[in-house]
Amino acid sequence: KEKNMNYKINRRRSFKEWIVEEYEATKLLFRSIPAGLLTLFVVAVVTMNILANKTIVQTTYLALDGGFLISWLSFLAMDMVVKHFGPKAANKMTVFALLVNLLVCFIFYIVSIIPTPYEDYTVFNQIIGGTWFILLSSAIAFISSGFINNFLNYGIGTMFRKNPNGKTAFFTRSYISTFVGQFCDNLIFSTLTFMFFAPIFWNGFSWTFIQCLTCSLLGALVELVMEVLFSPLGFMVTKKWHKTGVGEQYLAYINRKI
């Protein structure tokens, strides 16, 4: 009997079993993540990609797009989910937000190409229709930086063995992972959009690498400041989650022994 139990525990799952378990875990996860946080996260992701269409500052050594004004909220939400549910859960939430963003962009594009007999909607169509390479650059940057942020946040958290649920642990892991993640997000997006695609499709408009680098650094610093301002709220919310048992069913499912 003991031998059979060890076999069940140690045997490798089949691909079908893995798919079924991941499906069940994902269903439980999205039932467990508070709807308010998930909504804010998705709205932030969709909004920052629309705002990224506008360059608000451009000098010889500096350039900033509008997306940095809201992107900090998405990283704070990811940090909170990593802390309570784990990095895998945050990655799934990141992928979900990306898929929603792609759907919204597709709907915007369809609306932008529908002809209308009324006033000129050229500017409106350009804004909501977006540009395919901005969407592509944004998707690559977001998914890459999201995964970097989530795993880095979790990794730093494992270093706090004495008081992993304390303020110091939460703030340290959030600040470091947010700065690194935001820098990667900004650099990947600005390099792909303004150095690779824009010179080809925007009549020669472009940023230099110095501008991309300074944009990435300054954007990460500004977003870090926002994280510092609002992370105490994030800490209090995650502490309340722990106290009230938010996501217990999901956590029990992923921590069970097979």
Label each region the model flagged:
Residues 1-4:
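Short, Lys/Arg-enriched N-terminal segments with co-localized hydrophobic residues
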Residues 6-98, 102-103:
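Hydrophobic transmembrane alpha-helices
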Residues 35-39, 69, 94, 135-136, ...:
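Hydrophobic alpha-helical transmembrane segments
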Residues 45-50, 75-79, 101, 105, ...:
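Transmembrane alpha-helical segments of multi-pass membrane transport proteins and ion-pumping complexes
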Residues 50-58, 106-120:
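Transmembrane alpha-helix boundary signature
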Residues 98-101, 113-117, 121-145, 158-165, ...:
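Membrane-embedded alpha-helical bundles of multi-pass transporters/translocases
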Residues 177, 181, 251-258:
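Cytosolic juxtamembrane regulatory segments of multi-pass membrane proteins
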Residues 178, 186-198:
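A structural feature that tracks compact, well-ordered secondary-structure segments
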